[in-house]
Structures are given as C-alpha cells and as structure tokens.
C-alpha cells in the first residue's frame, strides 16, 4: 500500500473525534521482507515479517480538556492498541462509508511554531499488528431510546471466506450516566432481510465512554454476502454517541 495523504477526512481516535483539529493525515502500510533463501537456490526468496502501519497526523495545537493536544500527548501517548479510524473522503459520516482502521500507539509527538505564528503539532500513530484495515463505518450517531436497532445492510460479495480475518472497532464518544448500556454485535446473513443472522463479533458491553478493537482471527468462513451491526440499548434516561467500524482482510 502506497502512502496516502488525506487533507479533508473524518478521524476517530479512541473515544474522541479529532477531525476538526487536524490539517492532514498520511496513511501508509508496509511489511518487513525477511530473506529465507536456501543453500544452492538460484533466486532469492522472502517471507513476510512484521507490518509497519503508520498514520502521520498534523494540525494546530489546541490545549485544554478534550482537545487535540492533551488527547494525543497526555491521554494516549504510548498507550497500546487505541483504534484509529480514518474516513478518507469526507469529514462527515455517511452510512457504510469506506474507511481504514487499525489499533494504534502514539509513538511520536512534537509541537512547534515560531514567534507570532500558530503553534502546530505532529504525531505518529503506528502498529506492527495489522495493516491499515480497509472497511466501513457502519454507524455513527447518537441513540436516545431503549431497544434494538440495526445499521443498514451492506452487501459484500463473498463475505469473509475461511482464512480471512474480521475486524471491528467501537468508539464511544459520550455516554450518559445512570446505568444505561450498549451492546454492539457484527452480524451477517445470506439474505438482505436477515432472517437467520450469524453473530460474527460481539463487542464488550459499553457502560461509559471508551473504545475497543476486536478481531476474529483465522475466522471460520462467514461467506454470506450481507452484513450489519446490531445495537442494543438498555436503561433510561439514555444518550450514547458512538461509531462502529468493521473490515475484512
């Protein structure tokens, strides 16, 4: 995957939407090529090593609770496996829009600026666990009513055949107090009506703001074509704002 630079994109990091504080994101995925050439071979052969996936983020420094600088420098610096989800084409959510996501660690952070200039920042979120997983943001919004709802079904021809992994990221941006809960499950089925859905990934029940990255590694075949997210909310009063990403790779 070549480096891709996005200058007008939506970005979720952990429990925060950081899009409005950034001016650009450069996303890249590479992998180590480890030589395994045998004695007497006439050609060199290689084996894939660790991934090197990075999102280089830059923008304008903003200090204060819930703002970009303390989020990246204090809250998440050197914290492992915080999901970052990048929507390349728009800062606004569109249902089932294409996105990339991976479990990241903020490995570098610096702020800089000359006298009389706006202070800027640069940060690098990276991982060796996965590539930048291509997928979809199945839902982003606020739920205020108890009950079960579903995202709009998305058709992915061939689904997730055996040997493919399924990935899911949950970003919970706000969560009302009072015992309300959110359960998110990724489902698929052979038919768009979901008469007999299969649960593929069940996220940990959410009771507060936070995030989770979950993987069905070496998944059994989920080759049905239609995919959706099931969302179950309980207890009132309730108001939960969250986003759900899933991808197959």
Model region roles, listed by residue range:
Residues 134-137, 232-249:
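Edge beta-strands of jelly-roll/beta-sandwich modules across compartments, strongly enriched
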Residues 65-107, 187:
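Short, acidic/charged, Gly/Pro-enriched secondary-structure junctions
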